[in-house]
Amino acid sequence: MPDYRSKTSTHGRNMAGARALWRATGMKDEDFKKPIIAIANSFTQFVPGHVHLKDMGQLVAREVERAGGVAKEFNTIAVDDGIAMGHDGMLYSLPSREIIADSVEYMVNAHCADAIVCISNCDKITPGMLMAALRLNIPVVFVSGGPMEAGKTKLASHGLDLVDAMVIAADSTASDEKVAEYERSACPTCGSCSGMFTANSMNCLTEALGLALPGNGSALATHSDREQLFLQAGRTIVDLCRQYYKENDYSVLPRNIANFKAFENAMTLDIAMGGSTNTILHLLAAAQEAEIDFDLHHIDRLSRKVPQLCKVAPNIQKYHMEDVHRAGGIFSILGELARGGLLHTDLPTVHSKTMAEGIAKWDITQTDDEAVHTFFKAGPAGIPTQTAFSQSTRWESLDDDRENGCIRSVEHAYSQEGGLAVLYGNIALDGCVVKTAGVDESIHVFEGNAKIFESQDSAVRGILADEVKAGDIVIIRYEGPKGGPGMQEMLYPTSYLKSKGLGKDCALLTDGRFSGGTSGLSIGHASPEAAAGGAIGLVRDGDKVLIDIPNRSINLMIDDAEMAERRAEQDKKGWKPVESRPRKVTTALKAYALLATSADKGAVRDKALLDKLVP
């Protein structure tokens, strides 16, 4: 039976000094016999998805203490991708994931904590904490801040979100008054942006991995029901500690819950709900922390057999996360996947002995439990606020229509092929990814002329200056993990292509990545990246490029001899942008770039290189 990790600093004569310091934090004699639960909060006033989290750590802490544990809260950083976007701030977004993972490891290991509650929400915070949890492999529960309500305005018949504001702002035909109205209406409350963007995608995937409570990904930040998730997280983590430290039950450890099959479940859900392509990057990174052999080839295999059962903004204007919740949330999607034979249901979770038990209890089409039905009727109030749990509005009915509703059955899927795909070819030997959920079927096969840009900034200038024409394939390179550095999101270029009326007439390929708000024929994560000698660095203006989603291929239409000749020429020049880029690459960013791998490896640190540098 394992000892509490915390005994290292709470027991024995030699730890008198440490105990003295623990006492200064409020601990008493009886507390040294209890598990110390680290509460990793990510409150910040910079990010709407985190602005309401200030008191959440203490809410969990009090419940931990009532359940018999000792709670100690600390904070991590949190970057808002939307605010950091469109300038050099975006260089810091993906590297912040590693900083978050490291900071959780540092705090938990330095103080010998026995377990963790991860209070996350937005784009890099949930992945960073997930990486840390799998690295540490001690009991953990994830609880997020919850999604934002969709925006409302008389100028639109559908709910609004951040992307709507960006697209309308770039539309030269839109009046200043209309732009201002969209801006004021798009993000009305606290919470992660209201569509199936990266933050909400990742919070949904923690449910599929078995590390979060049902409703974690879909219950609105503003709704009073969400408070119960925080309270239950406090009780659950103490129970997990009891099972592991007192009952010798290793099945509750995160690597045993989030095993290979659980990663398949998470990716299956991601494909079925048309999640952000960033989730692929983050799942690959988390799998490496868990020492699981899960890669793009596994994702490619799943993408060919999993149908799309849910469609949410930005892939469709009609639905946002509040509608997913009304339709039964993530466990109703998992239930449909299970009935289709597409899910591993024999796996443990933090709340149920098996995923099958969890589905039986929480899928609204399988349970008659009125409390569950009431929970999923929680809806938006339509009142701008930055306060959590501030409203108790409920829908009059659930959306249990599996033929035409927000969530569909396998038989009535939006499409029989899912919302994400992996493409391979001579331009991306190690793969690249596309969110097919946001691509019109008429352009699933697209051949066009390459239009080269060697930075996101120059691409934005070119698109706004009408240098990009119908039939072009915009290539934005040297924006990968090393080349950026930091693998910027390309939401502005894709949004501006839409605003120029080119959303269905152009494609975009990059070794950078995309916001979860991106739609259209936008292909990212090209691996190897240009800075690592990837063939995307060999494309020239006017080259023909063929994209074939049905056959999962993407190719530069030149022969092998020409490709080899170009590679030899580029080797002499060096793999760097031709044009000078006025961006300040600090020591912190250089350190990230030194060790960063390409996107097919999750853009994590190159551990083999690190082992050579520090044997």
UniProtKB/Swiss-Prot annotation:
Q: Which InterPro entries match?
A: Dihydro-acid_dehy_C, DihydroxyA_deHydtase, DiOHA_6PGluconate_deHydtase_CS, ILV_EDD_C, ILV_EDD_N, IlvD/EDD_N
Q: Which domain of life is it from?
A: Bacteria
Q: Which GO terms describe its biological process?
A: isoleucine biosynthetic process; L-valine biosynthetic process
What does UniProt list as catalytic?
A: S515
One GO molecular-function entry = dihydroxy-acid dehydratase activity
Please share the entry's free-text remark on the cofactor: Binds 1 [2Fe-2S] cluster per subunit. This cluster acts as a Lewis acid cofactor.
Q: Which PROSITE patterns match?
A: ILVD_EDD_1 (PS00886), ILVD_EDD_2 (PS00887)
Cross-referenced SUPFAM superfamilies, in alphabetical order?
IlvD/EDD N-terminal domain-like (SSF143975), LeuD/IlvD-like (SSF52016)
A Gene Ontology term for the protein's cellular component: cytosol
Q: Where does [2Fe-2S] cluster bind?
A: C122, C193
- Where does this protein act, in terms of pathway? Amino-acid biosynthesis; L-isoleucine biosynthesis; L-isoleucine from 2-oxobutanoate: step 3/4; Amino-acid biosynthesis; L-valine biosynthesis; L-valine from pyruvate: step 3/4
Look up the signal peptide feature and give its range.
none
Extract the Pfam families matched here.
ILV_EDD_C, ILVD_EDD_N
**Binding residue positions for Mg(2+):** D81, D123, K124, E489
Q: Which PANTHER family match?
A: D-XYLONATE DEHYDRATASE, D-XYLONATE DEHYDRATASE YAGF-RELATED
HAMAP family named among the record's database cross-references:
IlvD
User: What family is this?
Assistant: Belongs to the IlvD/Edd family.
- Subunit composition and interactions: Homodimer.
The job of this chain, per UniProt, is described as: Functions in the biosynthesis of branched-chain amino acids. Catalyzes the dehydration of (2R,3R)-2,3-dihydroxy-3-methylpentanoate (2,3-dihydroxy-3-methylvalerate) into 2-oxo-3-methylpentanoate (2-oxo-3-methylvalerate) and of (2R)-2,3-dihydroxy-3-methylbutanoate (2,3-dihydroxyisovalerate) into 2-oxo-3-methylbutanoate (2-oxoisovalerate), the penultimate precursor to L-isoleucine and L-valine, respectively.
Would you tell me the protein name for this molecule?
A: Dihydroxy-acid dehydratase
